[in-house]
Curated annotation (Swiss-Prot):
Its main location: secreted. GO terms for biological process: defense response to bacterium. Belongs to the frog skin active peptide (FSAP) family. Brevinin subfamily. GO terms for cellular component: extracellular region. The keyword tRNA-binding does not apply. Expressed by the skin glands. Has antibacterial activity against the Gram-positive bacterium S.aureus ATCC 25923 and the Gram-negative bacterium E.coli ATCC 25726. It is found in: Secreted. This is Brevinin-2HSb. InterPro entries: Antimicrobial_frog_2.
């Protein structure tokens, strides 16, 4: 239903945000930016 769709969108958005934060952190730590 609609709620499931919204929930999945929220989960995917959170995963995407977390991934970019992790990428930024590892990039800064290894100085590959």
């Amino acid at each position: 239903g609609l709620l499931d769709t919204l929930k999945n969108m929220a989960i995917n958005a959170a995963k995407g945000a977390g991934q970019s934060v992790l990428n930024t952190l590892s990039c800064k730590l290894s100085k590959t930016c």
